[in-house]
UniProtKB/Swiss-Prot annotation:
Similarity remark: Belongs to the ABC transporter superfamily. Lipoprotein translocase (TC 3.A.1.125) family.
Membrane topology: Peripheral membrane protein
Function statement: Part of the ABC transporter complex LolCDE involved in the translocation of mature outer membrane-directed lipoproteins, from the inner membrane to the periplasmic chaperone, LolA. Responsible for the formation of the LolA-lipoprotein complex in an ATP-dependent manner.
Enzyme kind, highest EC tier: translocase
Subunit text: The complex is composed of two ATP-binding proteins (LolD) and two transmembrane proteins (LolC and LolE).
Any one biological process term the GO annotation gives: lipoprotein localization to outer membrane
Upper lineage: Bacteria, Pseudomonadati, Pseudomonadota, Gammaproteobacteria, Alteromonadales
Protein name stated in the entry: Lipoprotein-releasing system ATP-binding protein LolD
GO terms, molecular function: ATP binding; ATP hydrolysis activity; transmembrane transporter activity
Disulfide bond sites: none
Residues annotated as binding ATP: G45, S46, S47, G48, S49, G50, K51, S52
Keywords annotated in UniProt: ATP-binding, Cell inner membrane, Cell membrane, Membrane, Nucleotide-binding, Translocase, Transport
Length: 233
């Protein structure tokens, strides 16, 4: 068991119920999970198992019906909307199945955008964005628009964007789901490499057990219930 000092995110008895008129559907059942600093964690489950909902709650994009989510001891869902937005921009990074890049901006500008929103120095931010794109193998594609990039290249830009503010935790929802096998493997390799080099924790939601097995640890979700974790290394 890892010491408490390495704990980054603690999810305690989190449940989620969706209401539709008189009907209610419980998608999470008292989930408990700890994410450690620099850890690479996979959440595996079939579609509709609740794994994406859990990821959204971890990122303050949705609120739990009950339970708590603590980031370095701070209860995320007791904070103001403004403070939650600050945490999403400063401490969390997000990667989705679809890259959500801004089509009118270059790869370099897309990566820099979260730092611009935070009001960071433009020249320094662009230099850091360039360095990140070089790190993900796209130093030669800085001025290209998303429409001029392949699917794998767009997702690499999205990964660089997620890291621009040096987050403590990156949340990735099916980041390879829209890619071919070769590109998907490259993206997972990049996630592992960056986690190890930068000390950033990654939580990756996926239905692909083979890819999840390459992470430090995986947990399995079925019908909103999280199973015991499996450590790989």
């Amino acid at each position: 068991m890892k010491p408490a000092s390495t704990r980054l995110l603690a999810i305690n008895a989190v449940s989620k119920v969706f209401h539709d008129g008189a009907c209610e559907t419980q998608v999470l059942h008292e989930v408990n999970l700890t994410v450690h600093r620099g850890e690479q964690l996979a959440i595996v489950g079939s579609s509709g198992s609740g794994k994406s909902t859990l990821l959204h709650i971890m990122g303050t994009l949705e609120s739990p019906t009950s339970g708590t989510v603590l980031l370095e001891g701070e209860n995320l869902h007791q904070l103001s909307s403004k403070r939650q937005a600050q945490i999403r921009n400063q401490d969390l990074g997000f990667i989705y199945q679809f890259h959500h890049l801004l089509p009118e901006f270059s790869a370099l500008e897309n990566v820099a955008m979260p730092a611009f929103i935070q009001g960071k120095n433009k020249a320094q931010t662009l230099a850091e964005a360039k360095a990140l794109l070089e790190r993900v193998g796209l130093g030669h594609r800085l001025t290209h628009l998303p429409s001029q990039l392949s699917g794998g290249e767009r997702q690499r830009v999205a990964i660089a964007r997620a890291l621009i503010n040096k987050p403590k935790l990156v949340l990735a929802d099916e980041p390879t789901g829209n890619l071919d096998a070769v590109s998907g493997e490259a993206v997972y390799g990049l996630i592992r490499e960056l986690a190890e080099q930068l000390g950033t924790a990654f939580v990756v939601v996926t239905h692909d057990a083979n890819l999840a097995a390459r992470m430090d640890r995986q947990v399995n979700m079925k019908d909103g219930i999280l199973s015991q974790s499996e450590t790989h290394r």
